[in-house]
Swiss-Prot record:
It comes from Synechocystis sp. (strain ATCC 27184 / PCC 6803 / Kazusa). Residues 6-114 form the HIT domain. PANTHER family: HISTIDINE TRIAD HIT PROTEIN. Gene3D superfamilies: HIT-like. This is Uncharacterized HIT-like protein slr1234.
Length: 114
C-alpha cells in the first residue's frame, strides 16, 4: 500500500485544491508553488508512489495520463507549447511520493533544465 500523501488527501477532498480536471482515473489541479504562469499537477487516482513503481498493468493508465496532460494543456491555453515533467525519486526532486506530471507553460523554458 502506498503512503498516504497530500495528493491522496486532495483526491479524497480532505484538503482543498484548485481542481481544473477530473475523471475516473486522474485529477489535475493548480500547483500551490507555480514555476510558470501555467503550472498544473496531473495525478492518477491509483496511489503509485513514482513512475518506477508502475507495472505492465499500469500501461493503460500511463497512456491515459499523457493524453489527459495534452488535453489539460489545451484547455488551459498552452496546448501547442508546454513542458511535461516527471520527477522519479528524491535525488531528482520528487517531494511527494505519489506519481504526478507537472504541466508547465506560459513562458519560455531553457535546456538543460537543472
Amino acid at each position: 500500500m502506498a503512503e498516504d500523501t497530500i495528493f491522496s488527501k486532495i483526491i479524497r477532498r480532505e484538503i482543498p485544491a484548485a481542481i481544473v480536471y477530473e475523471d475516473d482515473l486522474c485529477l489535475a489541479f493548480k500547483d500551490v508553488n507555480p514555476q510558470a504562469p501555467v503550472h498544473v499537477l496531473l495525478i492518477p487516482k491509483k496511489p503509485l508512489p513514482q513512475l518506477s513503481a508502475a507495472t505492465p498493468e499500469d500501461h493503460a493508465l500511463l497512456g491515459h495520463l499523457l493524453l489527459k496532460a495534452k488535453e489539460v494543456a489545451a484547455d488551459l491555453g498552452i496546448g501547442d507549447q508546454f513542458r511535461l515533467v516527471i520527477n522519479n525519486g528524491a535525488e531528482v526532486g520528487q517531494t511527494v511520493f505519489h506519481l504526478h506530471l507537472h504541466i508547465l507553460g506560459g513562458r519560455p523554458f531553457s535546456w538543460p533544465p537543472g
